[in-house]
Amino acid sequence: MAEQNQRTNTPDNGPEFAIQRLYIKDLSFEAPRSPQVFLEEWQPELNMDLATKVNDLGEDNHEVVLTVTVTVTMKESHIFLAEVQQGGIFTIKNFPKEEMRPMLGSFCPNILYPYAREAITDMVVRGGFPQLYLAPVNFDALFEQHEQSEEGNSGTEDRVH
């Protein structure tokens, strides 16, 4: 009965969004200066890089992979590198075409980031280093910035898709 009520309350052509699966696709931690680095005063410099990749899986299913790479250096020496590729399979159905890019480029990475951040933090602690607190990321602003840079490059032949 509940299924029938749910079906009748949602029009067949209305927008649908569902998380099908969240998973770690790749995980890597390198600490080339262990254990010597543990004897030094801890004054790290952190750099974080983000990237997203979208794969169309057909039937309104999309894989979004968020790659978070954290590199920590001290006195220009590489201390550790932690990287995670956090994946998700999302069903995105009946959304207007102009809303698909923001859904895949911003909304889905917003869902994936807390999982990636937790994986990075866990690796760093297990590597013997102090816990990292990675700041929240405004994927909406990053997506908008990316879209504007693509518009600015639309007249050049070196455009990257």
Curated annotation (Swiss-Prot):
An example Gene Ontology molecular-function term: unfolded protein binding
Signal peptide (residue range): none
Biological process, per Gene Ontology: protein folding; protein tetramerization; protein transport
Alphabetically ordered keywords of this record: Chaperone, Cytoplasm, Protein transport, Translocation, Transport
Subcellular location: Cytoplasm
Cellular component, GO, one term: cytoplasm
Highest taxon listed in the record's lineage: Bacteria
Subunit field text: Homotetramer, a dimer of dimers. One homotetramer interacts with 1 SecA dimer.
Function, in words: One of the proteins required for the normal export of preproteins out of the cell cytoplasm. It is a molecular chaperone that binds to a subset of precursor proteins, maintaining them in a translocation-competent state. It also specifically binds to its receptor SecA.
Similarity remark: Belongs to the SecB family.
Protein name: Protein-export protein SecB
Organism: Coxiella burnetii (strain RSA 493 / Nine Mile phase I)
